[in-house]
Design a protein with these regions (language model features):
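A short tyrosine-centered beta-strand micro-motif
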Residues: 132, 213-223
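Bacterial N-terminal signal peptides
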Residues: 8-19
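Short coil-to-beta strand junction motifs in C2/discoidin
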Residues: 77-130, 150
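Exoplasmic/lumenal beta-rich domain surfaces
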Residues: 129-130, 138-213, 251-252
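Boundary/junction segments of secreted and surface-exposed precursor proteins
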Residues: 25-78, 252-253
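Short beta-strand elements
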Residues: 98, 231-253
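Sec/Tat signal peptide C-region and signal peptidase I cleavage site
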Residues: 20-24
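Beta-sandwich strand segments
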Residues: 27-32, 37, 74-79, 140-148, ...
Length: 253
């Protein structure tokens, strides 16, 4: 997350000494010398997988499974508080190495999102947690501008599958599926270290319309594209896989 208002290092250290403090807008506490006191999260996203196409009413939908992975020293955890009819503002909770946590204002918003009856109706999800895009790849292998994007913007943060075991990774789920109560004033979402939130290719809006496209493209998935979450590494939030369109069932160009 890019810095918004700079905070003197001494003030950050004083904030870290508090067990649970809501802070004013600050620079990323997971960057700089003070980060050593924190178990900062880090989100990554795996390359698109299980890719296939589906033709629907003249559209050609390129579908793929997404895997948002928690790979930092601590969990990615958001605390939402209602600020509108179907929206919540959030604070991010970051745990301290010696116990306790700090709470910092986050730029992330939660939206009560409908995903169809087959997938359970509506859930509180993080708005713009990830996006999918297609970029044309030239004969020289250079990746160009975005040509198509997915309509999907909102995602849960949850412990769905434990995808990387380790000493910092809990064996059992800590963060359940997203809340479905539209009247809740507060909710918590998160993904533990070593766990993933995975959406199958057949999920609601898990596609890009590729009708009419021909040639080689980079299918990119980006987590936290707006950089509204505090992480220890902002440079590993994108993955991609090359695909040739029309798609013939195998990645690569």
């Amino acid at each position: 997350m890019r810095a918004r208002v700079l905070l003197a290092p001494l003030a950050v250290l004083l904030a870290l000494a508090l067990p649970s403090t809501a802070l004013a807008a600050v620079e990323n506490p997971c960057e700089g010398a003070e980060a050593r006191f924190l178990l900062c999260p880090n989100l990554r996203i795996a390359p698109p997988s299980e890719i296939y196409t589906q033709e629907v009413d003249g559209h050609v939908l390129l579908r793929a499974t997404s895997d948002v992975q928690s790979r930092g020293k601590g969990p990615m955890e958001l605390r939402g508080q209602r600020d509108g009819w179907r929206s919540m503002k959030t604070n991010q909770r970051i745990y301290k190495a010696g116990g306790g946590h700090i709470t910092v204002p986050s730029g992330a918003k939660l939206r009560f999102t409908y995903v169809g009856t087959y997938f359970g109706g509506s859930y509180w999800k993080v708005h713009q947690l990830a996006n999918f895009e297609l970029r044309r790849v030239g004969p020289d292998g250079k990746v160009g501008d975005v040509v198509r994007t997915s309509p999907k913007l909102n995602y849960c943060l949850r412990d769905l599958y434990r995808t990387r075991a380790g000493r910092r990774s809990p064996e059992n789920r800590v963060y359940p599926g997203c809340n479905q109560d539209p009247f809740r004033d507060r909710v918590a979402l998160g993904t533990s270290v070593g766990w993933s939130d995975i959406y199958p290719a057949a999920y609601h809006q898990q596609w890009i319309d590729v009708a009419g496209l021909r040639g080689c493209f980079a299918y990119r998935m980006i987590v936290d594209p707006k950089e509204v979450l505090f992480e220890s590494n902002e440079n590993d939030n994108m993955s991609q896989r090359l695909v040739h369109l029309p798609y013939r069932g195998k990645p690569g160009c």
